[in-house]
């Protein structure tokens, strides 16, 4: 008499496995890096095999990829899109301009996307190759697998 196999795991591991293998990025292309980001959606790089499906709606996305120069006019709009994304959410800053403002050191440019939203992964380069974005998504998958899926709320003080 054979018994059915038993799979032992934790709910954290199961949730993180599902989240890491179904990343749906919100495309937020602002400049040259957006062209490289668009190339990743083509058949040559095939991000679909990693469970990555680009979405146009923030309510259907869990990853925001900021690609290009962020101006102060765009900063408020980008923050609004970030706030509309469901939890948990992650942000990838793609390219030198999104990371530090790049060569645009003017009054109208935000010197890094991390001044507007919390950034999880920084991609260096001008403009980073699609392979670099692919590697960043794999690093993000690893980061998600190592995180705690179920957040424990801090005990509330009564006094």
UniProtKB/Swiss-Prot annotation:
It comes from the Bacteria. InterPro entries: NADH_UbQ_OxRdtase-like_20kDa, NADH_UQ_OxRdtase_20Kd_su. Its cofactor is [4Fe-4S] cluster. GO terms for biological process: aerobic respiration; electron transport coupled proton transport. One of its GO terms (molecular function) is quinone binding. It catalyses: a quinone + NADH + 5 H(+)(in) = a quinol + NAD(+) + 4 H(+)(out). One of its GO terms (cellular component) is respiratory chain complex I. It is an enzyme of class 7 (translocase). Its main location: membrane. Keywords: 4Fe-4S, Cell inner membrane, Cell membrane, Iron, Iron-sulfur, Membrane, Metal-binding, NAD, Quinone, Translocase, Transport, Ubiquinone. It is a peripheral membrane protein. Binds 1 [4Fe-4S] cluster. It is found in: Cell inner membrane. [4Fe-4S] cluster binds at residues 32-33, 97, 126. Its EC number is 7.1.1.-. Belongs to the complex I 20 kDa subunit family. NDH-1 shuttles electrons from NADH, via FMN and iron-sulfur (Fe-S) centers, to quinones in the respiratory chain. The immediate electron acceptor for the enzyme in this species is believed to be ubiquinone. Couples the redox reaction to proton translocation (for every two electrons transferred, four hydrogen ions are translocated across the cytoplasmic membrane), and thus conserves the redox energy in a proton gradient. NDH-1 is composed of 14 different subunits. Subunits NuoB, C, D, E, F, and G constitute the peripheral sector of the complex. This is NADH-quinone oxidoreductase subunit B. It comes from Helicobacter pylori (strain J99 / ATCC 700824) (Campylobacter pylori J99).
């Amino acid at each position: 008499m054979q018994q059915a196999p038993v799979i032992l795991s934790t709910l954290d591991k199961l949730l993180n496995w599902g989240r890491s293998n179904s990343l749906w990025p919100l495309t937020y292309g602002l400049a040259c890096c957006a062209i490289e980001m668009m190339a990743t959606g083509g058949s040559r790089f095939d991000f679909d095999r990693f469970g990555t499906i680009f979405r146009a709606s923030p309510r259907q996305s869990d990853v925001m990829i900021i690609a290009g120069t962020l101006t102060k006019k765009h900063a408020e709009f980008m923050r609004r899109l970030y706030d509309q994304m469901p939890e948990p959410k992650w942000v990838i800053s793609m390219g030198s301009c999104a990371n530090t403002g790049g060569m645009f050191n003017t009054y109208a440019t935000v010197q890094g996307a991390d001044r507007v939203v919390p950034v999880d992964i920084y991609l260096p380069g001008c403009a980073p190759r699609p392979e670099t974005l692919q590697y960043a998504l794999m690093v993000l998958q690893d980061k998600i697998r190592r995180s705690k899926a179920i957040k424990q709320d801090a005990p509330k003080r009564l006094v």
